[in-house]
């Protein structure tokens, strides 16, 4: 019995995920080449600036099967590009290879592509089918879709908490809530994102490095939201800013009286970004998110503290949550909550999340949630 378009597209979507942490700010894309109801090639976008999924899939076809590419069907999880970037247009490669049919899961919202690849292939005589397994494919490219459509990054909130929901004691002590294996998992997550961000409270309390250890191939930018320019010059973040990209986001109004401190931060290697004067804290945060996205940040992991996570929640900008629950019962009415901010007054206005993954890490529980699309 012949396999369906949905079956082959599921293979393409699965292949796309092999690029996670390597291709951003490009989207993860997979491609499967099928001839005579048999998969003859499979590929994915492997690294930023490298060949795209379609070319990798055709290259993977064994020599004795190369003649089957002409007349084959290509299943692509995202519309093939039609413009010259770091690589040539993928639709041109499919046309040149004499692919007969192209099945697409998601039409690319990028104005440089958006239907143009489809039109170009149709003019060349290729049959094009769209909207196959779209929901599943959109989950994989959700960060790219958000940045392309809204100019904002995909925000991943990460925190560790006790079983009664505290991220620190009333005194601010938080080391350690989760176990060593969970903390190693955090470094794996850092290697997958474009930037890691904390608020100044966390930076002052923990004096963190925020870089993935061991380092991955990608360079992760460290971001500190520091409205009043309080980050010490002898902090680990500042002292290592020549080694790891470090952006300090300050309030443009406060910056007027902190010229010497800002100059010292910049001399140490930090990049200092100033918001437009006169903005409130949430407006400044949204402005910062737009700045990061416009500079190639697709995936932004925010590691606290409660104030910045609360502000992001109030702005409806938390897209994904990675939660490590340590097997500790803390108590105390003044213990610190992971998400502060204003929050809604009614439970039915709370941000609805969908559980994606649950994993036991020794005596910790690791959970992943994604925001439910309210559209």
Label the model's feature ranges.
Residues 30:
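Helix-turn-helix
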Residues 65, 122-123, 148-150, 320, ...:
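Short alpha-helix boundary/capping motifs
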Residues 33, 38-136, 221, 252-254, ...:
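Zn2+-dependent cytidine deaminase-like catalytic core
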Residues 36-43, 136-149, 238-241:
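A short, flexible N-terminal coil/short beta segment enriched in small residues
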Residues 22-23, 49-50, 118, 132-160:
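Proteins enriched for Cys/Gly/acidic motifs involved in redox and nucleic-acid/cofactor modification
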Residues 2-27, 42, 61, 86, ...:
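Enzymes that bind and transform nitrogen-containing heteroaromatic metabolites
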């Amino acid at each position: 019995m012949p396999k369906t378009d949905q079956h082959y597209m599921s293979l393409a979507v699965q292949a796309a995920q092999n690029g996670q942490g390597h291709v951003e700010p490009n989207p993860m894309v997979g491609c499967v080449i099928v001839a005579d109801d048999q998969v003859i090639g499979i590929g994915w976008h492997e690294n930023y600036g490298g060949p795209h999924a379609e070319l990798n899939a055709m290259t993977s076809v064994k020599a004795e099967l190369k003649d089957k590419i002409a007349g084959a069907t290509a299943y692509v999880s995202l519309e093939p590009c039609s413009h010259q970037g770091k690589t040539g247009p993928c639709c041109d490669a499919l046309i040149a290879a004499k692919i007969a049919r192209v099945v697409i899961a998601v039409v690319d919202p990028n104005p440089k592509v958006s239907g143009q690849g489809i039109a170009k292939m149709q003019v060349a005589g290729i049959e094009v089918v769209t909207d196959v397994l779209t929901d599943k494919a959109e989950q994989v490219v959700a960060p790219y879709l958000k940045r392309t459509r809204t100019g904002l990054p995909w925000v991943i909130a990460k925190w560790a908490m006790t079983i009664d929901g505290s991220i620190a004691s009333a005194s601010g002590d938080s080391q350690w809530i989760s176990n060593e294996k969970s903390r190693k998992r955090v470094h794996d997550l850092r290697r997958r994102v474009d930037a890691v961000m904390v608020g100044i409270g966390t930076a002052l309390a923990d004096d963190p490095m925020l870089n993935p250890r061991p380092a991955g191939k990608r360079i992760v930018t460290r971001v500190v939201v520091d409205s009043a320019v309080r980050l010490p010059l002898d902090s680990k973040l500042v002292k290592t800013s020549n080694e790891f990209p470090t952006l300090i986001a300050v309030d443009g109004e406060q910056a007027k009286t902190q010229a010497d401190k800002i100059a010292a931060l910049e001399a140490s290697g930090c990049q200092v970004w100033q918001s437009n004067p006169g903005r409130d804290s949430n407006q400044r945060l949204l402005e910062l998110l737009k700045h990061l996205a416009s500079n190639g940040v697709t995936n932004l992991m925010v590691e606290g503290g409660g104030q910045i996570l609360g502000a992001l929640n109030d702005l409806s900008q938390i897209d994904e949550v990675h939660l490590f629950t340590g097997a500790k019962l803390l108590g105390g009415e003044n213990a610190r909550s992971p998400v502060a901010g204003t929050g809604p007054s009614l439970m039915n206005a709370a941000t609805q999340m969908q559980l994606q993954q649950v994993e036991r890490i020794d005596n910790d529980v690791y959970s992943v949630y994604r925001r439910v699309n309210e559209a």
